[in-house]
Design a protein with these regions (language model features):
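Active-site phosphate-binding strand-loop segment of PLP-dependent enzymes
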Residues: 269-316
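Conserved beta-loop-alpha segment that forms the PLP phosphate-binding cup at the N-terminus of a helix
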Residues: 185-190, 202-231, 245-249
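Non-catalytic terminal extensions of PLP-dependent enzymes
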Residues: 2-182, 186-190, 423, 435-437, ...
Length: 572
């Protein structure tokens, strides 16, 4: 057995020194880790503050803080028992009114809440379908609905129904079982790629609509940034006028959103503001061609330059413009930014474009196409899981099974109408939009009190009250009373008309009715001035809703009304 030559007392002293040094080293390590964490914390939030100040400026950042505080305290105010009770009462009344208008009632209305014990005969089912089709509704057939129904004609509807019948059981998730659907889907994507001047290695997918196309484009951009640059806190920059689907995508996929103003008089995205907001976490820039609210095409060439310079994907939302914006030049109209190289894949920075074939492609509802500059961009939206016990799983988008009948209906529409047919419809629609725009600018009655927003060059024309003498939402309600279903806008308060083939045929009546209701509102305004406080103001639905939305900073009440509306859709 070995032993130390050192005295026991010295050995104990050395052991004590060793223990003290070990404890001291541990304390140093803990302090070091704490300091590193603190430095990283300071760096992280200093960096965030720097990018916020650079993007929004000092006053813009202060304004953002002020808005957040105002919303917070207003939310507290709305939760005060007396206030909350009054708000709850009014919200309940409004939702009850919604149900009265939307849920069909009466002695002739039969509600089917459970499966029938015995199935109906085909004749009985057809009779019920005829009743449902005949329920009172806004007459889109007469061209009185803005957008919504992009109707290609009765013959096309019959052809689409035949395509549905042939491929009603088809599902593109099984290409070996339904090879015809696979072929049609690939050809639809190819046709849309050609319309938007994609390079030879362009790629795309079909989706259920514009929202899904936008969601997938945002997801692909987020995944690309994560895989290639390691971005874990993604950010996206969009115009204020971009479609709400981009905001939905940020909510779903946890992407920080920056909304950039679209200042008057052009109402296009502020390019300098976009530039200031770009930082290492930016995963996507967005432009619209055109945007939904005002029908304005953002400065895509300028956005493309930013995207190229900073190596960031750029998505162009052509969901609304669809085939009309793609064929403007061939129809004899000015193309957006033609002198600067166009608005599509001819711009080197454009990496993806969303196009709704169920709008001006006149395909059945539930059809849209998302196209990419190349396959590598598209691959970022794929979901692949090779370890599932059910086998290797792969899907191109959020959906698994998809209706092959919709793809067949879309393919049949594109093949039936052809380029010449789409050019003709583009001509008819744009001529109607220009006629309506001209009437607002030049009509002796309309031009005195209304003005066009920006310079729309596609199918959407938005207008607002010029001098404040007339509430634009009262105009919307008056037109609704005449059977029109137009779109009310906010920030600024306005109305827009998205022209379709049915609407184009009714443009003269729309102009006449607009002039008439303006005269009516002028008479009401004069009566209001004469009676003063004794005048009883009656507000229509649009005026009441958007009047509330614009007058309070906290939109929770409006959100509750919207939630009630959605609930009403599922009340049998």
């Amino acid at each position: 057995m070995s032993s130390s030559m050192l005295p026991v007392a010295l050995q104990n002293k050395l052991v004590g020194y060793g223990r003290a040094s070990s404890a001291h080293l541990s304390a140093l390590n803990i302090d070091l880790i704490r300091n590193i964490v603190f430095i990283l914390f300071i760096f992280r939030y200093t960096r965030k503050t720097f990018y916020s100040l650079r993007g929004y400026g000092i006053f813009g950042s202060i304004r953002n803080v002020y808005i957040s505080l105002r919303l917070f305290f207003y939310g507290i105010f709305l939760r005060i028992p007396g206030v909350r009770g009054q708000v709850d009462k009014q919200v309940k009344e409004a939702i009850t009114n919604l149900e009265t208008k939307l849920v069909n009632t009466g002695p002739d209305v039969v509600r089917y809440l459970t499966l029938p014990k015995e199935g109906m005969t085909p004749e009985q089912v057809r009779a019920e379908l005829d009743k449902l089709a005949g329920l009172e509704h806004t007459r889109w057939e007469d061209g009185r609905v803005s957008g919504a129904v992009y109707h290609g004609g009765e013959e096309l509807l019959k052809l689409q129904a035949e395509a549905f019948g042939q491929f009603g059981v088809a599902n593109p998730i099984h290409p070996d079982v339904f090879p015809g659907v696979r072929k049609m889907e690939a050809e639809v994507v190819s046709m849309v790629l050609a319309l938007f001047n994609a390079p030879s290695d362009g790629a795309g997918v079909t989706t259920s609509g514009g929202t899904e196309s936008i969601l997938m484009a945002c997801l692909a951009a987020r995944q690309k940034a994560f895989l290639e640059r390691g971005v874990t806190e993604p950010e996206m920059i969009i115009p204020d006028t971009a479609h709400a689907a981009f905001i939905k995508a940020c909510n779903y996929f946890k992407i920080k959103l920056h909304r950039v103003p679209c200042p008057e008089p052009e109402f296009k995205v502020d390019i300098n503001a976009v530039r200031r907001l770009i930082n290492p976490n930016t995963v996507l820039l967005v432009g619209s061609a055109p945007n939904f609210p005002h029908g304005i095409v953002d400065n895509i060439p300028a956005l493309s330059k930013l995207a190229t310079k900073y190596k960031i994907p750029l998505h162009v939302d052509c969901c609304l413009g669809s085939f009309v914006v793609a064929l403007l030049k061939k129809a004899g109209f000015p193309e957006p930014y033609e002198e600067d190289g166009g608005f599509d894949f001819r711009q080197p920075g454009v990496t993806s474009i969303s196009v709704d074939t169920h709008k001006y492609g006149f395909a059945p509802k539930g059809n849209s196409v998302l196209i990419y500059r190349n396959k590598s961009y598209r691959n970022n939206q794929y979901f692949i899981y090779p370890d599932w016990s059910g086998g290797v799983y792969a899907s191109p988008s959020v959906a698994g099974s998809r209706p092959g009948a919709l793809i067949a209906g879309c393919w049949a529409s594109l093949m039936s109408i052809g380029e010449t047919g789409y050019i003709n419809s583009c001509t008819e629609i744009i001529n109607a939009a220009r006629k309506f725009e001209t009437s607002i600018r030049t009509d002796s009655t309309i031009s005195l009190h209304m003005e066009v927003i920006g310079n729309p060059i596609v199918s959407v024309v938005a207008f607002r009250s010029k001098n404040g003498a007339i509430d634009i939402y009262d105009i919307a309600d008056d037109l609704s009373a005449k059977g029109w279903h137009l779109n009310a806008l906010q920030s600024p308060a306005a109305i827009h008309v998205a022209f379709t083939i049915p609407t184009a045929k009714a443009v003269d009546q729309l102009i006449a009715d607009l002039s008439e209701v303006i005269g009516k509102e002028l008479e009401k305004a004069e009566e209001r001035r004469a009676q003063g406080k004794a005048y009883i103001l009656k507000r229509g639905d649009t005026s009441a809703l958007y009047g509330v939305a614009g007058s309070i900073p906290d939109k929770s009440v409006v959100s509750r009304l919207a939630e009630g509306f959605l609930d009403t859709l599922y009340k049998a």
